[in-house]
């Protein structure tokens, strides 16, 4: 295990489940809000999640800069 290459993990709470996507509906598009930010600076992202997910679930995000494209 390489301890020199540590990755920062951000916790995010699912605020809204938008739709199912993917060729077989295996991916769910959700809106998440980052935890641990200041009250006036809530930051939300649109993410694709593989597997079961519900509103108010907590996700561990390794990459927090990229946002998923909105699907119809």
UniProtKB/Swiss-Prot annotation:
A GO BP annotation: translation
One Pfam family, short name: Ribosomal_S28e
Record keywords, A-Z: Ribonucleoprotein, Ribosomal protein
The keyword Ribonucleoprotein is annotated on this UniProt entry: yes
Gene3D superfamilies, per database record: Nucleic acid-binding proteins (2.40.50.140)
Signal peptide start and end residues: none
Top-rank taxon, per record: Eukaryota
GO cellular component assignments: cytosolic small ribosomal subunit
GO molecular function, one term: structural constituent of ribosome
Family to which the UniProt record says this protein belongs: Belongs to the eukaryotic ribosomal protein eS28 family.
Identification of the protein by name: Small ribosomal subunit protein eS28
């Amino acid at each position: 295990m390489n301890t020199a290459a540590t990755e920062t993990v951000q916790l995010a709470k699912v605020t809204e489940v938008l739709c199912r996507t993917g060729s077989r509906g295996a991916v769910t598009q959700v809106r998440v809000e980052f935890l641990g930010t200041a009250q006036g600076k809530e930051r939300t992202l649109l993410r694709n999640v593989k597997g079961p997910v519900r509103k108010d679930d907590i996700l561990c995000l390794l990459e927090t800069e990229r946002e998923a494209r909105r699907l119809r």
